[in-house]
Amino acid sequence: MNETIVVLGAGVSGLTSALLLSRDKRNTITVVAKHMPGDLDGEYASPFAGANVMPMATSDESQWERETWAELKRLCQEVPASGIHFQKCQVHRRNKDISMNSDVPKGPFDTNPWFKDMFDDFRELPQDKVLPGCDGASEFTSVCINTAIYLPWLVGQLLENGVQLKRGVVSDIREAKRLSHTGRPATLIINATGLGSYKLGGVKDTNMYPARGQVIVVRNEVDSMLFVSGTEDGANEAVYAMNRAAGGGAILGGTFEAGTWDTQPDPTTALRIMSRIVKVRPDIAGGEGVAGLSVVRHAAGLRPYRHGGARVEAEKMDDMTTVVHNYGHGGWGYQGSYGCAKSVVEIVDKVREGRTRAKL
């Protein structure tokens, strides 16, 4: 049975869902979104991501990230045009951060992480390699994604597969049914609106909330990714740095401010972020401190967090149109993108099979 599918949202979750669905030629797909790759708006989270693979799920919920790692690793090795490269990653933990109540994710700093068998070269660092003030550290090879290249690359893959993209704003998810480029009513809607699901009519998921993240993009380079579990500047701040592929600059961060909707960068916060980075990695600025950082831009985006975790499931609307939700990924949208999109495809296939059986 052929499906006419409308995907709402052109962040990494929506685009990846559309990509995997487009590999089945029975699906005719239209992506409709308020924001498209190339836009910079705080409510459009995907361009502001680092983006990298730093596992955040619990062991029981790790399958999405495991499946995504395999694909991102393949793209890094085989498809340089995707804008992904390998980079060594160091994770430094302070025991007091792990036990305190803060918005900073705790999963990456587990002393016995589930993902140690996902990375071939995972190792605990000797104490003399641990940053001062930290209690332990680990190291492994991860990937960093230049989102300014990767998101347009995804769009290119969609166009090659016959997917149509168009801008549009909907106030209610039911409106998506009439937005297919074919002119036919959609038989399936994929809701990948992220934080938009908080206000979207027909969804209005009050479990959604923003976690503001402020970063600085600089021309300086870091020779490896760095993550530190916390700071002395407040429970909602951490230290991280990574190099985007293909001249994308280094991302310096950052903050995890739950419930904060403000997308304007704060100069005081920016100074704290830069000061912390040059303190633990003075080499990034040539030993010149903050003055040695060549700033490209300051930015703040809203991570789409959800109480109870990501929502990846089907729902029937009152007119019996099926909606498949794929939103609420918080700060792990990229590193869970292919796993979640695979789940979307599996749900769509089950819906299709159910309709076929019903007609027999």
Predicted regions located by residue number:
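Helical element adjacent to the flavin cofactor pocket in flavoenzyme catalytic cores
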Residues: G136-L188, A192, S197-Y198, I347
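Glycine-rich FAD pyrophosphate-binding loop
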Residues: R23-A45
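Flavin (FAD/FMN) cofactor-binding and adjacent substrate-gating region
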Residues: A70-G162
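Flavin-dependent oxidoreductases
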Residues: T16, Y44, A176-R272, D283-E288
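N-terminal Rossmann-like FAD-binding beta1-loop-alpha1 element of flavoenzymes
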Residues: E3-V31
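C-terminal catalytic lobe of FAD-dependent flavoproteins
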Residues: D128, W153, G287-L360
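Short beta-strand to alpha-helix junction loop
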Residues: S59-T68, A137-W153, Q264-T269, G336-S337
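N-terminal glycine-rich dinucleotide-binding loop that anchors FAD/FMN and/or NAD(P) in oxidoreductases
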Residues: Y44-A70
